[in-house]
Amino acid sequence: MATMLFQGHGSYRFVCDDGTTVYVDPFAGTGYDLPADLILVTHEHFDHNNVDLMPRNEGCEIIRAADVHPAPELYRTVASHGITVTGVQACNKNHPIDECVGMVLELDGKTFLASGDTSMTDDMRSGKLAALHLDYAVFPADGFYNMDVAEASECAKLVGAAHSIPIHLVPIDDPNDPAQLFDAAKAAAFDAKGKIVLKPGDELTL
């Protein structure tokens, strides 16, 4: 089973059973020591796309929003290193829908919604994501660049993943400031089925 390391803010890392290492929205915290096989960037804001933080294995690939959302209304699936990545909607007033994506990952037999920066989307309202019966999903809830905790909780109910994780809880400018990587009060207020709270540095076996 894959292991997830939450690095803080919107950054996290997966290590699969075969050692494949995947970074999602690299920027914050620590844990960039393992060479990357795959780097996922949900959008090009500075706090999600520092792809030079980690060493890379030969053949490392970077999948960006445009790779799975190449045109309006078009979302597609790509595969790399045995991991399937499917683009889904991500947007709000600070994140244009045609520049941002969420990514549904399939790795080591589990499904995981890497939501990116977003508020409630039509993919959530329509039941499209609920129909996937996801194992895990993360939801940003800073209430400034993204939705607040109440809306994130509602989104979690609509998506219906077996486990939901609040992330991106504080507006950030310093990736090394622990106070900007996590907000315990917001995490506690997040209300979702199978809620899991991860602090920076925590690991989760999927």
Question: Which residues does each PLM region occupy?
Answer:
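A short helix-to-beta-strand connector/capping loop
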Residues: M1, E58-G59, H81-I83, F190-G194
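Core dinuclear metal-dependent hydrolase active-site scaffold
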Residues: M1-L34, L38, D67-L132, M147, ...
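A short helix->loop->beta-strand "cap" motif at the edges of active sites that frequently abuts
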Residues: T20, N57-I63, G160-H163, D191-K193
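Di-metal (Zn2+ and/or Mg2+/Mn2+) metal-binding site signature of metallo-dependent hydrolases
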Residues: A28-D67
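Short, charged/polar "capping" segments at the starts of alpha-helices
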Residues: F46-N50, V68-A71, I172-P178
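Cap/insert and terminal regions of metallo-dependent hydrolase folds
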Residues: D122-E203
